[in-house]
UniProtKB/Swiss-Prot annotation:
Its EC number is 6.1.1.4. This is Leucine--tRNA ligase. The keyword Protein biosynthesis applies. InterPro entries: Leu-tRNA-ligase, Leu_tRNA-synth_edit, M/V/L/I-tRNA-synth_anticd-bd, Methionyl/Leucyl_tRNA_Synth, Rossmann-like_a/b/a_fold, tRNAsynth_Ia_anticodon-bd, Val/Leu/Ile-tRNA-synth_edit. GO terms for biological process: leucyl-tRNA aminoacylation. ATP binds at K728. Gene3D superfamilies: HUPs, Isoleucyl-tRNA Synthetase, Domain 1, Valyl/Leucyl/Isoleucyl-tRNA synthetase, editing domain. A motif ('HIGH' region) lies at residues 66-77. GO terms for molecular function: aminoacyl-tRNA deacylase activity; ATP binding; leucine-tRNA ligase activity.
Length: 955
């Protein structure tokens, strides 16, 4: 299923100077060497080792950096890379100082798993893979400033990842100031008595351990004994985001269990409001903003207190619908809720409903069995599970608005991380509650009047409140609609001390530890009291030790009771260390977890700015220049950040949310001037491909499949075609090297940009690549004589219609490049080149048109453009421009074409002078022979002229 470059098989049959794959290869290698020698894409900084003369006009454009896998790139990977390069090259030609580089997100599980299997150090594998990627990327002619390249696994890089971790560790969130502050300021407040301790004792009377416990409860990084996702088969915990809907790990498909473990957490929830509110300040796709808003899940509602019967205790519930309190018929706690053990009754009540007991002899037995089953499900699985399960705890609570007793259940569809880990169930208005009530025989009370025609079940629509009054407590919501009812019930709850209005979030704090080897070590040690201490900057970097075994201890994938044993714990000489942390030499124990793969990607754009700085993670002057706020360009609410960030929509929540969080902490602490890392975000689409399976369902090599009469065959057997991702496992992967060998890198670049809008997915078709190659050949022929190699251009004045076409193309292509519409830019360039071929094939095209055309092609096909620009007599590179500007006088049309509609159908077209008035246009339309024939001697009933657009004749 492949195409063949024109004239690339038998060089004896083609002219000597034709643009072939071989010609392209020679040109591309020559210009890539020259760019490297001249430092063509080096972007100067205002300060530091890369200091140079900087322009006020700058552009910082960045790709989401790749993980260097062992399989290398396929043609789908460079789509975004080429797109950013085209945009960067265009802006560089406009005279801007453009920072564009590429790094590698190189920590990760695949290299570690390969190390476990082969004994090869992950660094060896990673560096080999990076070199392969670089070879492929360089061949594409991407204009990167390679001085700025980083990899997250480089020790000088992760030294600063560790440093940033310590800045966050040594910070707390001041809710009054609404920003992070150094932890030392919090300690000073306690010491001065400006902030009270939890039990009211003076700070000086507390022991060191008590003081640390209080301080640590405020930190933005803290240790927590909390429910985590434990994957015994991997030997590590994983974040919620790394668990599939099936309750398995994203990598390896291992079962995941919920269990309590002590883990590092980052208090991202402190930034929930700012992370939501500042989305309005960003030039991002609405889809990504919605994804982040939904992930954070800000909900306004109320906390309601339900007293427990026979106890002084109570259950606090968060609800977004306090107006439905009269419809509460039971409560549900998350299985992990700390109150469960306390409130679980010793015995069942007399004659319990067997649906409530789970077949257990006592509530405690039922709860224990259910908790174990729930621990084997992921949060996503628990939320999406359609079969409602649960058990009665034997406890009852009182509904504060009507005094009704309601049973208390535990059920896995309630999660500990959202709200209070407890819900009030209103089966009349919530489908999950309704399904649970039906399964357990619980009553349903409606509190909202359903609309006419409602057929039963839970009613989630709007309507007046019903069944919602209790005169004994002075509360009547009946007849009210939502907003009024919510306001009234919250006021009642607050005045009667039964609850309060509040805001809750779905977002939970970020689990920030992995039991792996190949990751950033934590810059933390534990003293003899088990207190975690951040290392001083002089002790950085904490370098990964050499170990004999790279794997964490793994367990039977179903062994939910196992506990993590990280591989770094095996490096005992490294883990047990003697240090002087200011109070003499003492023995400490290093933290043996590593950071998640997300850590390096949270801040790498800042290191691109200042990659050689060994005194700071970034010089403030360089950060201000490249990422600082520019209200004069972007409006008064500009948060700053790099100018364009391109990557896949799959990173819409995790990477982007984590990176925004880290950046905001750095901003609060005064380390950066920008409030956001990415001012503008653009999601490129995907290149997809056909894959083929035989009768066994086994994938067969796509390039060996033949098409005959609309059917597909592999080695004579008919195969089934499917459309989707491109990848090695699907045997439909196409290497960019293969395409560059067959056509040249410029052809591949042009084809990928011409396939469709950059933000849309599109099918790969090798047979169509030759079309882009032929365009470049035709462009070459308009400049170079294929037989002699001589220039074909003339110094003749272009015809006026050619000048109009040229300047119309310049105006359109400039706009297309500016708006990332590269496919339409290609179409305009092809159209102009075709005009030159048509008008000047015999004589040669005018230099005044050829030169601008070559410059316009340069961002897309830079190697060929450089070669043609050189042949046109220019000494330097065109990489820094100038990009052509349109002359307005040629954009004004002398004539206007009007389509003529007769009774609603287009029957003809007329061309009139652009200066023609409506009467002249009307007369010309009525004189058109097709209109005359359609009227057949009749007078038209109406003639409507829409200036510049159409004439509508009603006969």
């Amino acid at each position: 299923m492949s195409g063949q470059a024109e004239g690339s098989t038998n060089t004896e049959e083609v002219p000597r100077f034709r643009y072939t794959a071989q010609t392209a290869a020679e040109i591309e290698q020559r210009w890539q060497r020259r760019w490297e020698e001249l430092g063509t894409f080096h972007a100067p900084n205002p300060a530091g080792s890369l200091k140079g003369e900087v322009s006020d006009e700058k552009l910082f454009v960045q790709d989401m950096f790749p993980y260097p896998s062992g399989s290398g790139l396929h043609v789908g990977h460079p789509l975004g890379f080429i797109g950013t390069d085209v945009y960067a090259r265009f802006n560089r030609m406009l005279g801007k100082n453009v920072l564009h580089t590429m790094g590698f997100d190189s920590f990760g599980l695949p290299a570690e798993q390969y190390a476990v299997q082969t004994g090869t150090h992950p660094r060896t594998t990673t560096e080999k893979n990076i070199e392969r990627y670089l070879t492929q990327i360089r061949r594409l002619g991407l204009g990167h400033d390679e001085r700025r390249r980083v990899a997250t696994t480089d020790i000088p890089f992760y030294r600063w990842t560790q440093w940033i971790f310590l800045q966050i560790f040594h910070s707390w969130y001041d809710t009054d100031a609404d920003r992070a502050r150094p932890i030392s300021e919090l300690e000073a407040q306690f010491a001065a008595g400006e902030r009270a301790t939890p039990d009211g004792r003076p700070w000086a009377e507390l022991s060191r351990t008590e003081q640390r416990r209080i301080i640590d409860s405020y930190r933005l990084v803290y240790l927590s004994e909390a429910p985590v996702n434990w994957a015994p088969g991997l030997g590590t915990v994983v974040a919620n985001e790394e668990v599939t809907a099936d309750g398995l790990t994203e990598r390896g498909n291992f079962p995941v269990f919920r269990r309590n473990l002590k883990q590092w957490m980052m208090r991202i929830t402190a930034y929930a409001d700012r992370l939501i509110d500042d989305l309005d300040r960003l030039d991002w796709p609405d889809k990504i903003k919605t994804m982040q808003r939904n992930w954070i899940g800000r909900s306004q509602g109320a906390n309601v207190v339900f007293p427990l019967d026979g106890s002084a205790g109570s259950i606090e519930v968060f609800t977004t619908r306090p107006d439905t309190l009269f419809g509460v018929t039971y409560l549900v706690l998350a299985p992990e809720h700390p109150l469960v053990d306390e409130l679980t009754a010793a015995q069942w009540p007399q004659d319990p409903d067997l649906r409530w007991t789970g077949g257990a002899a006592t509530p405690a037995e039922a709860v224990a069995q259910y908790r174990r089953a729930a621990s084997m499900k992921s949060d996503l699985d628990r939320q999406e599970n359609k079969e409602k399960t649960g058990v009665f705890t034997g406890a009852w609570a009182t509904n504060p608005v009507n005094g009704e007793q309601v049973p208390v259940f535990i059920a896995d569809y309630v999660l500990m991380g959202y709200g209070t880990g407890a819900i009030m169930a209103v089966p009349g208005e919530d489908q999950r509650d309704f399904d649970f009530a039906e399964a357990f025989g619980l009553p349903v009370v409606r509190t909202v009047q359903p609309s006419e025609g409602f057929e039963g079940g839970a009613y989630s629509g709007e309507g007046p409140r019903i069944n919602s009054a209790n005169p004994d407590v002075g509360l009547d919501l009946n007849g009210m609609h939502l907003d009024e009812a919510k306001k009234t019930i919250i006021e009642w709850l607050e005045s009667h001390k039964h609850g309060s209005g509040t805001v809750q979030y779905k977002l939970r704090d970020w689990l920030f530890a992995r039991q792996r080897y190949w990751g950033e070590p934590f810059p933390v040690v534990y003293d003899s009291d088990g207190i975690p201490l951040g290392l001083p900057e002089s002790e950085l970097p904490v370098v990964l030790p050499e170990v004999a075994d790279y794997s964490p201890r793994t367990f039977d994938p179903e062994d939910a009771d196992s506990r993590p044993e990280p591989p770094l714990a095996k490096a005992t000489e490294w883990a047990n260390v003697e240090l002087d942390l200011g109070d003499g030499l003492k023995n400490y124990e290093r933290d043996t977890n590593v950071m998640p793969q997300w850590a390096g990607s949270c801040w790498y754009q800042l290191r691109y700015i200042d990659p050689d700085n060994d005194q700071a993670f970034v010089d403030p002057a360089n950060e201000r220049y490249w990422m600082g706020k520019r209200p004069e360009l972007h409006g008064p609410d500009d948060p700053g950040g790099l100018d364009l960030y391109i990557g896949g929509v799959e990173h819409g929540v995790l990477h982007l949310l984590y990176s925004r969080f880290w950046h905001k902490v750095l901003y609060d602490l005064g380390h950066v001037s920008s409030e956001e890392p990415y001012r503008r975000l653009y999601n490129q689409g995907y290149i997809q491909a056909y894959a083929y399976t035989d009768s066994r369902g086994v994938y067969v090599p796509a390039e060996e499949v033949e098409e005959r009469d609309g059917k597909f065959f592999f080695q004579g057997e008919e195969v089934r075609r499917e459309y989707g991702k491109m990848g090695k496992s699907l045997k439909n992967s196409v290497s960019p090297d293969e395409m560059a060998d067959a056509y040249g890198a410029d052809t591949l670049r042009l084809y990928e940009m011409a396939m469709g809008p950059l933000d849309a997915s599109r099918p790969w078709a090798t047979k169509d690549v030759v079309g882009s190659h032929r365009f470049l050949q035709r462009l070459w022929r308009n400049v170079v004589d294929e037989n002699t190699g001589e220039l074909r251009v003339t110094d003749d004045e272009p015809a006026i219609e050619v000048l109009r076409a040229l300047h119309k193309t310049i105006a359109g292509v400039r706009e297309d490049y500016r708006e990332l519409r590269f496919n339409t830019a290609v179409a305009k360039l092809i159209e102009l080149n075709n005009l030159l071929t048509k008008e000047y094939s015999a004589t040669g095209a005018p230099r005044a048109v050829v030169g601008p055309l070559v410059l316009m092609v340069a961002p897309l096909a830079p190697h060929m453009a450089e070669e043609l620009w050189s042949k046109l007599g220019h000494d330097g590179s065109l990489a820094h421009g100038p990009f052509p500007e349109a002359d307005e006088q040629y954009l004004v049309e002398d004539t206007v074409e009007y389509p003529i509609q007769f009774n609603g159908k287009v029957r003809s077209r007329i061309v009139v002078p652009a200066s023609a008035g409506q009467d002249e246009v009307k007369a010309a339309a009525l004189a058109d022979e097709k209109v005359v024939a359609a009227l057949d001697g009749r007078e038209p009933r109406k003639v409507i002229v829409v200036p510049g657009r159409l004439v509508n004749v009603v006969g």
